[in-house]
Amino acid sequence: MASVNGNGHAAGDNKARLIFWEVTKGCNLRCIHCRASATELSSPTDLETKRALGIIDQIAEAANPILVLSGGEPLYRSDIFQLARYATDKGLRVALATNGTLVTKEIARMIVDAGVKRVSISLDGADALTHDAFRGIPGAFDAALYGLCNLKSLGTSVQINMTIARHNARQLPQVLDLARSLGADALHTFLLVPVGCGVDIAAEQMVSPEEYEEMLNWFYDRSLEGGIELKATCAPHYFRVVRQRRLAERQAAGVGATRVPAPDPSHIGPTDMIMPGGTGISLKPAGRPAGHPSGHPSDMNAMTKGCLAGTGVCFISHEGEVFPCGYLPVIAGDLRKERFADIWQNSLVFHQLRDSGNLKGKCGCCEFRNLCMGCRARAYAATGDYLSEEPFCVHQPRTNGTHPKRPTPDGVR
């Protein structure tokens, strides 16, 4: 069911293309920013194997998404390889989001044998001191590097994720250098979102909107260098930055102020993946130029649009609840009571998010709203309203009015 926004902009077919599944809350680390508020042991409310396999059946019947198995720490589940292999055999592209510390040579082989296409490993600093302070356990940095090397030795596609906060923001260039030296296929950065444990450290650790904007411009510059796939994840503003920078480049080159064409914001490349709650994955097609996923930041068809929560992305909790994304704690449905297809097609939360005409404040009147949408999770964290304006955007829209909204489509609950 396609929705239409208040400006007459169709939000595409809204197929579920990226599904992030928190298969357990159990984890061996104590990350101070943890979205999941993970526990030392697997939760008794983690879905049992039979029900988990049934959810995979529902997903495969409803769509053909990339399925990211995350946590907590997904390797805490004794049946994780059974789930990965089952999903792979159902035709789903499976990725694994792990902290890397449990990836021995044997585990790395089991990951590959289960059909996992890419593994993401989080590095929240360029050295052990910085990373381990964020992850809460001494030795986590060295163990993560060991796990990464074990995966690379088998030819596995590996992605590094970095959560940006005050304690490590200055190390971003060093983390990029480290990712390149380790042979990582991708580096994804995330701005800290105040959810879960992140609420307690937000005031101390979140960078300012101005610093955030500076980082996105730095990221654009680095994306032109090639050699590694780069994505600013949970950073919808990046699409505006790219548009503005490309326009400035055209003007500087004497091309004139011709408007840079917008990519179709509803398009999601079939092998590209963005964020989960806390761990992002991207699968890059073979033969695509290195650096920016589609060769140049102006060619964003593989990058899709900004915030994808509820439009092409959703998140499944360890108990089976469905959310727009892992950072937006607003329940759209419950797989213990409803089928996935029904939730995806009929959730009122999802339909509200698919209609950019519902956006409020400066997001509602911004010329980039269909491209960016603002981070709905940060809006919710700041105001309790996931349709309010993005609090970490420095851009001032050219207009100051809001666009009219259209009625909710029939059949939406």
Where are these regions (language model features)?
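Short Fe-S-cluster ligation motifs
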Residues: G54, Q58-G71, R354, E390-R413
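Flexible loop residues that form catalytic
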Residues: T39, G72, G100, D124, ...
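Accessory C-terminal segments flanking Radical SAM cores
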Residues: A235-T399
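Regular, well-ordered alpha-helical segments
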Residues: A36, S153, C375-A377
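Radical SAM enzyme [4Fe-4S]-AdoMet core and its adjacent flexible, acidic
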Residues: M1, S42, L47, D113-A114, ...
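Conserved alpha-helical substructure of the radical SAM core
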Residues: M1-R118
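Structural motif corresponding to alpha-helix initiation and N-cap regions
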Residues: T49, L53, R77, T104-K105, ...
